[in-house]
Amino acid sequence: MDTAVDTHPPETKPRYGLELLAVLSVSFGLDGITALLSFIRAQVTINHGLGFSKVATGPIKEATKSAYQWLDILDQVVSILGGVAAAFLAIVLLMRSPGGPGLGVGLDRLRSREVLQGLGFAALIGIPGIAFVYVARRLGLNAQIVVTNFPDVWYRVPTLLLEAVQQGIAEEVVVAAYLLTRLRQLGWTNSRALATESVVRGSYHLYQGYGGFIGNAIMGLVFGWWFQRTRRVVPLIVAHAVIDAASFVGYVYLHGRVSWI
C-alpha cells in the first residue's frame, strides 16, 4: 500500500484545516447537514406523520410535535451558520496575507469601547433610517417588504436575534473588511474603493426598491469611511446587528399595527 508523504511544514496544518472547513461550509458541508435534517424530518413524517397524528393523542402527539419543533430549530441554526460561512471564508483568506494584529481588520480582541461605538452607529444610521423608510414608502420608492414570516413559536425572537447577528457578521466582514482590504491591496484609491463598496452594499438591497438601494448605499459610505480610517470592523458588526435586530423584532410586534410597516 502506498503511503502519502506529507512534505508541508507542521505549522501550515491548522491553516489548511481552517481552509478546508471554510470551503466546505460555503459548499457541500452544510448541504449535507441540511439533507440529513430533511431525511430525519421525512422519517418522522412517515412514522408519526400527518395521517397518523390525526388520530394520535397524548404523549405520542406531543412527542411528534416536539420532534418537528426541534428539527425546525436545527434548520434555523444551520441556516444561520450558512449565513456566517461567507464571513468565515473571508477571514481565512485574510489570514493568507500579512495584516498585523486582528488580520488588519480589528478582529484581535473585543473592546468595550467598540461596542459603545457600534451602538452609536446604530443610532446614527437607524433613527434617520426609520424616517427615511417612512418617506420612501409614502413616495412609492420602497416596496412593501415582509421583513420576516417566521411563525409565532416560542423560539421566534431568539432566532431573529441570531439572524440579526449573522447578518451583521456576514455583511460587515465580507463587504466592509474583506472587500475594502483587498481593493486597497489592488492599489485602488480610498474614494474609488469606498464608492464600489457603497454600490455593492446597495445593490443587494434593490429588492426593497429605490429607497432600499439609496439607504443602504449611504450606510455603506458611512461604514466604509469608518473602516478605512480605523481598520476596525467590530463596531460595524455591532451596529448592523442592532439595526437588524430592531427591524426584525420591531416588524413582528408592529406589523398590522403601524400602517406603513
Predicted regions: what is each one?
Residues 1-104, 249-261:
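N-terminal, membrane-interfacial amphipathic/helix-forming hydrophobic leader that caps
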Residues 8-15, 64, 68-72, 106-110, ...:
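Membrane-helix interfacial "entry" motifs
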Residues 15-23, 72-80, 114-118, 156-160, ...:
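Residue-level signature of transmembrane alpha-helical entry/exit and packing/kink sites
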Residues 29-32, 126-130, 134-261:
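Transmembrane helix-loop-helix hairpins at the membrane interface
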Residues 36, 40-44, 73-74, 111, ...:
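Generic hydrophobic, helix-prone segments enriched in Leu/Val/Ile
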Residues 100-103, 110, 114, 178, ...:
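Generic structural microfeature
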Residues 101-105, 144-147:
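Short, hydrophobic secondary-structure boundary micro-motifs
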Residues 104-127:
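Interfacial segments of alpha-helical transmembrane regions
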